[in-house]
C-alpha cells in the first residue's frame, strides 16, 4: 500500500525540491565579484559559470528522465540531491576558476536530474487543467526561492567568504533529500520502455517541439538578465552587496504576481492561448 501525502504539503515539498536551480544560481550571484577577486580573473569568467551551470542543468534533465522512469521519482530525486550536495561541497576546494567550472557543471547536472523527478511526480498525480493549476501553484511557491536566495547569499557574503555559499547549498540539498526520503511516496509504476524510442517520439512531435522552442526562447531571455544582474548592480551601478537582494527581488515580486494572474486565467482560458499572448507581450517588451 502506497503512503498518502497531504495535498498542500506535497506542493510545498515539490516546490522546494524543484528549487535547486534557482537556489544554485541566485544564492551565488552576490558572490560573483568576490570570486573574481579570489581567483584573480575577469568578472566575465565567473559569470560564464552561470552558462556552464545551465548547460549542465539541461543535460542532467536528459539523463534524469530515464533514471526517473527506471528507478522511480523518489530514488531519482535522492540521487540527484546527493550528487548536487557532493559537488556543491567540492566547489569549496576549487583551486582555479576552471576547476570551479567543472564542479559547477556537475552540480547542475545532478540538479537537472532532481528537477525532472519533481515535474514527473506532479504529472503522475495530476493531468490537464488540474496539472496546469498545480504547476502554477508550485511556481508561485518556488518563486520565493529566487526572491530569498540573493538575501541568503548577501547575508553569507557579509559574514563569511564566498565558500560559505556552497556550504549553504550542500546543507540545503541534504536537508531536502532527508524530507524526500522521509515523506515523498513513490508515484510511478515501472513499465519497460525503449529510451531511444521515447526521445524519438518527443523530438518528432511537432506540438512538443514548438512548446520547447517557445520555452527555450522565453527562459533564454530571462537567464541573460539573471546572468548580468550581479555585474550591472554591483559593479556598474556600485550598489553594495547588502542591497543587491532588494533590487534583484523586484523582478521576482513581479514574477510571483504574474504567476497568480496565470492561475486565475487558467480558470477561464486554455493554457496554449495564455502562453501565446504572454510570449508575444514578452517579445514586445524585450
Across the structure, where does each feature detected by a protein language model lie?
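Juxtamembrane intracellular "pre-TM" segments in multi-pass secondary transporters
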Residues: 1-4, 185-212
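Helix-to-loop junctions at the C-terminal end of transmembrane segments
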Residues: 61-72, 258-272
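Cytoplasmic helix-loop-helix junction between adjacent transmembrane helices
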Residues: 103-142
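Helix-loop-helix hairpin linking two adjacent transmembrane segments in secondary transporters
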Residues: 99, 128, 136-181, 246
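Conserved MFS/SLC helix-loop-helix module at the cytosolic interface between two early adjacent transmembrane helices
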Residues: 59-98
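Extracytoplasmic
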Residues: 9-43, 225-230
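Residue-level signature of mid-helix packing/kink "hotspots" within the transmembrane helices
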Residues: 26, 54-62, 146-147, 252-256, ...
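Transmembrane alpha-helices of Major Facilitator/SLC transporters
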Residues: 246-267, 282-285
Amino acid at each position: 500500500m502506497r503512503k498518502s501525502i497531504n495535498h498542500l504539503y506535497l506542493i510545498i515539498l515539490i516546490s522546494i525540491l524543484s528549487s535547486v536551480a534557482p537556489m544554485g544560481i541566485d544564492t551565488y550571484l552576490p558572490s560573483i565579484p568576490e570570486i573574481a577577486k579570489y581567483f584573480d580573473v575577469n568578472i566575465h569568467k565567473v559569470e560564464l559559470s552561470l552558462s556552464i551551470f545551465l548547460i549542465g542543468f539541461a543535460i542532467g534533465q536528459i539523463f534524469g528522465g530515464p533514471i526517473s522512469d527506471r528507478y522511480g521519482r523518489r530514488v531519482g530525486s535522492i540521487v540527484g540531491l546527493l550528487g548536487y550536495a557532493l559537488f556543491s561541497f567540492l566547489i569549496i576546494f576549487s583551486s582555479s576558476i576552471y576547476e570551479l567550472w567543472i564542479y559547477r557543471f556537475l552540480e547542475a547536472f545532478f540538479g537537472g536530474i532532481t528537477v525532472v523527478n519533481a515535474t514527473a511526480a506532479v504529472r503522475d498525480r495530476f493531468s490537464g487543467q488540474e496539472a496546469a493549476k498545480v504547476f502554477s501553484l508550485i511556481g508561485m511557491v518556488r518563486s520565493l526561492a529566487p526572491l530569498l536566495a540573493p538575501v541568503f547569499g548577501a547575508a553569507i557574503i557579509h559574514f563569511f567568504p564566498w565558500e560559505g555559499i556552497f556550504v549553504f547549498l550542500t546543507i540545503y540539498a541534504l536537508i531536502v533529500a532527508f524530507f524526500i526520503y522521509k515523506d515523498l511516496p513513490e508515484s510511478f509504476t515501472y513499465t519497460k520502455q525503449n529510451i531511444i524510442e521515447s526521445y524519438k517520439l518527443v523530438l518528432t512531435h511537432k506540438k512538443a517541439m514548438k512548446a520547447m522552442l517557445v520555452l527555450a526562447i522565453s527562459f533564454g531571455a530571462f537567464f541573460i538578465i539573471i546572468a548580468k544582474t550581479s555585474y550591472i548592480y554591483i559593479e556598474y551601478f556600485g550598489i553594495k552587496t547588502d542591497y543587491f537582494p532588494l533590487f534583484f527581488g523586484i523582478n521576482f515580486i513581479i514574477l510571483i504576481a504574474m504567476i497568480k494572474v496565470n492561475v486565475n486565467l487558467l480558470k477561464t482560458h486554455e493554457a496554449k492561448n495564455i502562453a501565446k499572448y504572454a510570449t508575444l507581450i514578452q517579445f514586445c517588451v524585450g
